[in-house]
């Protein structure tokens, strides 16, 4: 175990605890930048999904891990971002303005959900957000004139300033850039008075209120920021899949997102990335591992779901 002694406030709020962190983060970034030349196309696609889910995980970690508000309908924000991006793209907007619209609308919906949720806590908040998830899924399925209903919407490759990002490598770097930007934003937020207020609310609402922290304001702000990051992830998810439909943003997706941050480690920015890595790669390794099992076991229906659930 390494002990780090801090002698001034600037060391306490630094992004890196010591020089070793700078080295390892730099090495990780180097590997991520070189990944398109090191990985096959299939695994590069999986890594792209890890980056996309990491952005969503950062938002949910901000809400659940740092503010203590659990959402069981978070896939709804993902869906709002994805469908907004799809509709704006079909209307002729380029990637950046469409992304701004997707992020903004998701954030606005987060505020709408956050305000009623101020009156409930714990399992009741979970039920409220779960109900919201069902409502959004139903709206996406019924509003056929805009969302295409159950037939879904097809998307094309993102258009950046007149240039189509159609290659897997180009889209990967776009996701990597937005992931780094989101991570730095969350890290700096957590070092600010706002981030400290989130943590204070998570630890004790009574103590936080006694220190002058406005619970309603900061809870709503946490919902808004979490939903905004989910909107960014949803926009990227829509372009990566190139087809979206309401069932992609149902209760199972919400449970996966919540498990992602719980398994990764609540209250840790790293946990969002570890959880996303687990969520994306575990089913792939289960599928690959079936080849080494006896035929009777390997071809048994539901094996993947069973192992995934047990883990």
Language-model segments: residues:
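Transmembrane alpha-helices and adjacent helix-loop boundaries
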Residues: 1-311
